[in-house]
Amino acid sequence: MAGGRCGPQLTALLAAWIAAVAATAGPEEAALPPEQSRVQPMTASNWTLVMEGEWMLKFYAPWCPSCQQTDSEWEAFAKNGEILQISVGKVDVIQEPGLSGRFFVTTLPAFFHAKDGIFRRYRGPGIFEDLQNYILEKKWQSVEPLTGWKSPASLTMSGMAGLFSISGKIWHLHNYFTVTLGIPAWCSYVFFVIATLVFGLFMGLVLVVISECFYVPLPRHLSERSEQNRRSEEAHRAEQLQDAEEEKDDSNEEENKDSLVDDEEEKEDLGDEDEAEEEEEEDNLAAGVDEERSEANDQGPPGEDGVTREEVEPEEAEEGISEQPCPADTEVVEDSLRQRKSQHADKGL
């Protein structure tokens, strides 16, 4: 009887002890923290850490399948970071659009190597072995670095980071309007258009105010002096222009006078030549008339061949009548000469 009663009691005690041990061990096991990741998240506030030492950065997005496939490889590579003497980081482009703009990330996933502020793009696969060989064999030395305006630390890329951060905020605001508040998409677009116009007008007003603040007006006496100087300069310029025009007019008048004198001299020369020609013509006509008259008067006696004077006289009279100039012809010649003289006189005037 005693042995039968002790058996159930021992069993109950053993069960209670096991339960107590399990109760005490459970919270300890639950309190153990999970394995900490060696990949350091990079943000806009701590990204300058990559300017010192050697780093490998990965740009990813939570919705990217290719990025999710390389997560385990990237974690394994980060665990060996102490052995490789390299730091490993990652950037979420959804949460940090400014950093994606600073590094000008256009494809995902994107990998970058940084060594003392010099950045290079890693274009190999995101596999642990390839990443490890890239560091151990120093394959990054054969890759052209991002220098000049392409460097993430340059002023150009800083401006690009600002633009990307603004675009990210606008995108989040658009999602808030359309998803959270349920506003139609076109209403959101109208809101952004109006906001852009208002912002532009406000910036223009600010620039005008700044220019007015930095613009120092001249004192009154200085402004009056400057106005007087300006007027005197304008008057001096007007006088110079007037003098130049007068000189030009004088030169034109002198040229016209010279041309008129030359024309008058030419006309006088032509008139003298015409008068000489007329005098020659008159002399020739007078000489012809004198010759004809002398021939008419100088008719000889009758010939030795026995021809009587009475027979010859009618013939010579007829020849003299035919050869003697007609008074009407001489009058016509004299009239033509007079007309020519009057024409030349008119030309001379």
UniProtKB/Swiss-Prot annotation:
- Cysteines joined through disulfide linkages: 64-67
**Which residues does the Swiss-Prot or TrEMBL record annotate as the active site?**
64 (nucleophile), 67 (nucleophile)
* PTM annotation (Phosphoserine): residues: 251, 259
TM regions (residue ranges): 190-210
Name the membrane topology term. Single-pass type I membrane protein
Q: Which InterPro entries match?
A: Thioredoxin-like_sf, Thioredoxin_CS, Thioredoxin_domain, TMX_domain-containing
Q: Which UniProt keywords apply?
A: Disulfide bond, Electron transport, Endoplasmic reticulum, Membrane, Nucleus, Phosphoprotein, Redox-active center, Signal, Transmembrane, Transmembrane helix, Transport
Residue ranges annotated as compositionally biased, kind Basic and acidic residues, are: 225-240, 335-349
Q: Where do the segments described as Disordered lie? A: 225-349
User: Where does this protein reside within or beyond the cell?
Assistant: Nucleus inner membrane; Endoplasmic reticulum membrane
What Gene Ontology terms describe where this protein resides (cellular component)? endomembrane system; endoplasmic reticulum; endoplasmic reticulum membrane; nuclear inner membrane
The protein's GO terms of the molecular function aspect are: disulfide oxidoreductase activity
> Where does the record place the Thioredoxin domain?
30-137
Compositionally biased region (Acidic residues): 242-284, 312-321
UniProt-listed Pfam families: Thioredoxin
Signal peptide (UniProt feature, chain positions): 1-23
This one is known as Thioredoxin-related transmembrane protein 4
Name the gene for this chain: TMX4
